[in-house]
Amino acid sequence: MLSIIRRKTRIVDITKQGNGNVPPACHLCSRRLTKEWSFGEGTICSFHRIRCRVQCGRSFWHQPETPIDGLSWDSTTWELTRISSSKDPDISGQKDKRYGRRKEKNPKTDPPALDSRVREHEPIHEHEPIPGRVGPADTKQRCKANLRGDSGFVSIGRSNHPKLSREDCHNTRVPPGTQGVRGGNVQLDKPRERPVSYQHGSKKRSEHRNPVSRSHRRKKAKTRTKTSKLGKSRDIC
C-alpha cells in the first residue's frame, strides 16, 4: 500500500517538475508521449493538440475561452501560443491540404474557345462533284465504259492492255458478240488443259530412267564383288 502511494507521489512530482529521463506529462490527461508541445507555462500532449485543432478549426492557434474535453481554460496559465517549429508550417485559417489539392487538380473551367485559324468549311452537297476528286458516279461511268469498250473513257493510270481494251494479241479489235471471247483472247468455253500428276516431270527424265529398282542394283553389285574375289583367290592357288 505504501509503495503504491509513493509511486503515485513520485508520478505527481515528475508531472509537476519533470525529469531528465522521463518527459513531462500533459497537464490535462497526464499522458507521457515522446513528443509534446509547450503552451505557455505547461505542456500539452499530441491528443489534446489534435482536439484543439479540430474544435477551433484552425491550425496552431486556440482561443482561451474554448474548452477542451470539457475542461475550462485559465487564461493566465493556458494562454496557447504559436508553436515555433519548422516541420509544422502555419496553415491557419485554411482547410485540409488534401481537399485543396484535389480541387486544384480538377478545376471546373469552361472549354477553351476554338482557334481562329480553324475555319468552318462550307457544306458540300452530296451529289455535287468535288474538284480534283473522282466521285462514285464518275467511277461507275468509267467501269461501264471499259466494259463496253468505249475509247472516250480512259482509265487513270492504266495502259491499253489487250485484255482490258478488248483487243487480241495482234492489236485487232474483237467484236463484242463473239462466243467464247471475253475481254480479249480469254476463252471461257474451252476448259483449260491441266497437266496430270505424272506429267509434271520433264519427258527426258522419264525416257532415260532405268526401270530396275535400286535394291535390285545393290544385289547385283554385291554378287559381282563376291565372284571377283573368288576368282582372284583361285588364280593365286
Curated annotation (Swiss-Prot):
Disulfide bonds: none annotated. Its main location: host cell. Residues 85-97, 116-130 have a biased composition (Basic and acidic residues). Residues 166-237 are extracellular. The keyword Transport does not apply. It is a single-pass membrane protein. Residues 84-237 are annotated as: Disordered. One of its GO terms (cellular component) is membrane. The keyword Transmembrane applies. Keywords: Host membrane, Membrane, Transmembrane, Transmembrane helix. Residues 1-148 are cytoplasmic. Residues 214-231 have a biased composition (Basic residues). The chain crosses the membrane at residues 149-165. It is found in: Host membrane. This is Protein VP5. It comes from Drosophila x virus (isolate Chung/1996) (DXV). The gene is VP5.
